[in-house]
UniProtKB/Swiss-Prot annotation:
Keyword terms, alphabetized: Acyltransferase, Amino-acid biosynthesis, Diaminopimelate biosynthesis, Lysine biosynthesis, Repeat, Transferase
Gene that encodes it: dapH
Pathway where this protein functions: Amino-acid biosynthesis; L-lysine biosynthesis via DAP pathway; LL-2,6-diaminopimelate from (S)-tetrahydrodipicolinate (acetylase route): step 1/3
First-tier enzyme category under EC: transferase
Protein name in the entry: 2,3,4,5-tetrahydropyridine-2,6-dicarboxylate N-acetyltransferase
Keyword match tRNA-binding: no
Swiss-Prot/TrEMBL GO biological process terms: diaminopimelate biosynthetic process; lysine biosynthetic process via diaminopimelate
Catalytic activity: (S)-2,3,4,5-tetrahydrodipicolinate + acetyl-CoA + H2O = L-2-acetamido-6-oxoheptanedioate + CoA
Function: Catalyzes the transfer of an acetyl group from acetyl-CoA to tetrahydrodipicolinate.
Family indicated by similarity: Belongs to the transferase hexapeptide repeat family. DapH subfamily.
Species whose genome carries this gene: Exiguobacterium sp. (strain ATCC BAA-1283 / AT1b)
Amino acid sequence: MLLTNAYEIAQYIKDAKKETPVKLYVNGQLAGLEIEEAKAFGTDESKLFLTTAERAAAFLEANASVITDSHLEYDRRNSAVPMLDTTRLNARIEPGSFIRDHVQIGNNAVVMMGAVVNIGAVIGDGSMVDMNAVIGARGTLGKNVHLGAGAVVAGVLEPPSKDPVIIEDGVMIGANAVILEGVRVGENAVVAAGSVVTQDVPPGVVVAGTPARIIKQKDEKTSEKTQLVDDLRSL
């Protein structure tokens, strides 16, 4: 289910059960020992439990006399939104990217290492989110968009009445550019690297600077420089 309304997302986060998932590695005399609602792997002498921090702590305290060693791993605290299950996507998702649940990713899209995609975001068919780029909550990329390395599409949850960022089809956004809340970037526009876009961008233009201004219409030379490579999107 895709959540794109700010009020719905806020309600979802409020109502979600906040958990701290952990991996608990334990050695000892563990025959018959279990943790409620946990997944367990291993033997009676050495086990891995997938559980929560609270249940892990209770288990360790209750069974201290038979446990010889333990180790706890975790990467979040009281998290409300899980990561997206990407196993069924017809897209290329590289390791080290962070994609939260309730995100929509189209066919042949690419999400590179270090990219962050927040709840309610949309990535259209054939679009690429390059290394360390960020798509904030409700940010929308159309089809065949390139979001350059380190670029930011600002998220909009607060204030909830503000419109999300919309990047239309065929837009090229250079490295480290920032698209601020509520901005719409028109079809086939180009945003130069390092630009800060504070207002809507018409289709088919090139903008640059801080704040970004129109510097020219997109021409043949610009199209050649910003051409997408289909081979990067093939699966």
